[in-house]
Amino acid sequence: MNTSPGIELGLFIALLAVLNIPLGTHLYKVLDKEGKTVFDPILKPLENLTYKLCSIDRSKEQSWIEYAVGLLCFNFVGILVSYLILRLQSILPLNPEKIGPMAPHIAFNTAISFATNTNWQSYVPEKQVSYFAQMFGLAVPNFTSAATGIAAAAALVRGIVRTEMKTVGNCWVDLIRIHYYLLLPLSLFIAIILLSQGVPQNFNAYVSYIPLELKSSLANLPVKLPQGPIASQEAIKLLGTNGGGFLNANSAHPYENPTPLSNFVEMLSIFLIPSALTYYFGLSCKKLGHGWSIWLTMTFCFLILTLSCFIFEQAGNPLFSSLGIKNQLNMEGKEMRFGIFDSSFFASVTTLASCGAVNSLHDSFQPLAGMIPLFNMGLGELIFGGVGSGLYGILLFVILSVFLFGLMIGRTPGYLGKRIGSYEIKMAVLALMIQYVLILGLSALALNSSWGTAALGNKGPHGLTEVLYAFTSTTENNGSAFGGLNATSKPFALLLGVAMFLGRYFVLIPILAIAGSLANQKRYASQTVFPTGGWLFIFVLGATIFLLAALNFFPALTVGPILEHFMIGMGKSF
């Protein structure tokens, strides 16, 4: 893409800010069960019919425990259905390539992966998943997992806003309205844009052809060109910050991401809902300035990390100098139509959000550039983050910032008129510690096992980074990978599945517990010690985020990508 990096980045942020207001306002209406949207004339009858068929009383609200149980049951049923579809796809329709059943341990890993919004892929979609399984076993969880995250965020926002109430909403009403009024219309719109750029949408059998370079060779072997309903799945893959590709090359494949314009639209789609949720939060608590302050904190962090990734990658490979190569640019693992900036830009966007879609190979980045996507995920997927999970993730850090600020000035911590007590802090720390323990603990377990070291594609610090990246990606529900790691073995598939499951649901429960606790509190007029807007808020929140991430991950990063960077400088590679 020939556009100046500065212009493209500026346009991206400007569009994100402009779209924040209408989409955030729409979210506010969607997450209010009495809210009226522009889609009511078409979708209201369908919504009411769904309530009737499912025997849902929309007027009844739930405690945080009931809300959590509802979300968990909804997701567990989804995991089971996806698993069965993947195992039985050989006898199900829409399978022109006669693809057989997926192996049990891979199906287990995949079902959990898509239900938890991770979309880690330990399989080759073109060879191992039928059209039916793609649409019903994988695309449907793309919607349900996104709706789950948004519903959990809405429950936390209600907990902050409400006073002396024991309920945080109705999970079934939230899930239905999020699907009908938000995800489906947006997905249709993005799918049409992608179709206009050349993304396929069909049910044809794969096309056999002989590439030009093979016609003159003795091989003369036909190659199969995949087909399928790609555009429809691509849209929700991005909007729902899911990330699982219809094709193995993901958004590097021209069928999923054919042009620079489609690339820009895909990146914008990833951040669209997480960004708008900050405006929804500001509307809900009647403090738009506070919502914008959170958005600015996210944006500043995003700019710093994106530019760092680009600068590190643009510096090139120092090993080229010893080979007499003048052009040191590292184009390995990158598409020529995107180049270094758009590859670095996409990598930063997809790892700051819990998306995991890729348009380049992160494993081929220079050590410090590859460290940025890893560090992004280690922050906790809260710089815009996943749909829903980004908002409740950063609100955890707001609560911790409030607590630390209150301790420093000797005042009882308070946030938007609510007291932040020991219970809220314990739940917030529990949600964060679960992630850190899983990432570092499971990485250590894999690196100290024979099956773990046997899966390494590279030795030395790069091999350590591959394993650390895998468990960070799965625990934080991102799904991107350092491709040098062979994670298809039974131990890896099962352990990564456990990481995804615990990293999603064992974080969700403390979030909803905080929502229930805050909703039950009175609002104290004087309980606003911590500023909810301005540069002090942005600085304290940003510092808290980076401080906690640095304390937890810096030791691992020093013996991984940082060590590899210095060793490459000395002429050693892995």
UniProtKB/Swiss-Prot annotation:
Q: Where mainly located?
A: membrane
What protein am I looking at?
Potassium-transporting ATPase potassium-binding subunit
Q: How does it assemble?
A: The system is composed of three essential subunits: KdpA, KdpB and KdpC.
Top-level taxonomic group: Bacteria
Q: How does it sit in the membrane?
A: Multi-pass membrane protein
- Which family does the similarity line name? Belongs to the KdpA family.
Describe the function of this protein: Part of the high-affinity ATP-driven potassium transport (or Kdp) system, which catalyzes the hydrolysis of ATP coupled with the electrogenic transport of potassium into the cytoplasm. This subunit binds the periplasmic potassium ions and delivers the ions to the membrane domain of KdpB through an intramembrane tunnel.
Q: Where in the cell is it found?
A: Cell inner membrane
Residues crossing the lipid bilayer are 7-27, 65-85, 136-156, 175-195, 264-284, 292-312, 390-410, 427-447, 494-514, 534-554
GO cellular component annotations, sorted alphabetically? plasma membrane
Q: Which InterPro entries match?
A: KdpA
GO terms (molecular function) for this protein are: P-type potassium transmembrane transporter activity; potassium ion binding
